A protein has these predicted regions:
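Loop/helix patches that line or flank the sugar-binding groove of alpha-linked glycan CAZymes
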Residues: 1-142, 148-153
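Short, surface-exposed beta-strand/loop "edge" segments at domain boundaries and coil↔beta transitions
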Residues: 140-141, 171-175
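C-terminal beta-strand-rich structural cap/linker in extracellular carbohydrate-active enzymes
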Residues: 175-190
Length: 190
């Protein structure tokens, strides 16, 4: 997998309220061109907050110290104000953090050929908000289930499994009559 700067700790885009806060020349040029064509400032700022390249260029949020522990000088871009809550130091203190989840996922990928070389088989008849699929290689079978929504989703799979490999919520005993929590995801070995 590709992991972009800050993604491994859950860094989020830093919202801007005005074009004066933007450094990306492509965003600035697009803004000026579209203002001349009659687009609203609010609409353009919203687009820049979603797609602007400055989001991927923010300083790494190392700690909750001044400038997120990145520098004692002035950073080239303003920091996301959430750096006091989302930073490397804080993530390393929590064994259930995004950082450690990435480590587990990478380890599973490196240690299990079924992830890389296994056949992919979509589980049919699930809600549009649920992604469920099998990875199969020889005698190895893994089931991956993810609720892609911010709402509870129901799913009933009459499948037994040997072991929960990874989960972002508490481990399950059964896959029958599941009420998947918002954004719940897990993988089991069948």
């Amino acid at each position: 997998p590709y992991i972009y700067n800050g993604e491994e700790i859950g860094m989020t885009n830093c919202p801007v309220k005005s074009i004066d806060e933007v450094e990306d020349i492509e965003s600035i040029n697009m803004y000026r061109e579209r203002i001349d064509k009659g687009y609203s400032k609010d609409e353009l700022i919203k687009a820049i907050n979603t797609k602007g390249r400055d989001n991927a260029r923010r300083p790494m949020q190392w700690s909750n110290e001044e400038n997120a522990g990145f520098t004692t000088g002035k950073p080239w871009l303003k920091l996301n104000p959430n750096y006091t809550k989302i930073n490397v130091e804080k993530d390393l203190e929590d064994t259930n953090s995004i950082f450690y989840t990435y480590q587990k996922l990478i380890r599973l990928r490196h240690e299990n050929a079924v992830v890389v070389d296994g056949d992919f088989e979509l589980v049919e008849n699930t809600s549009d908000n649920i992604l469920a699929f099998w990875r199969k290689l020889e005698d190895e079978k893994w089931l991956v289930v993810a609720n892609l929504s911010g709402k509870k989703q129901n799913l009933n799979l009459d499948i037994s499994f040997k072991k929960v490999l990874i989960s972002n919520y508490e481990n399950r005993d059964s896959l029958k009559d599941m009420a998947l929590k918002p954004y719940e995801a897990f993988a089991v070995k069948a």
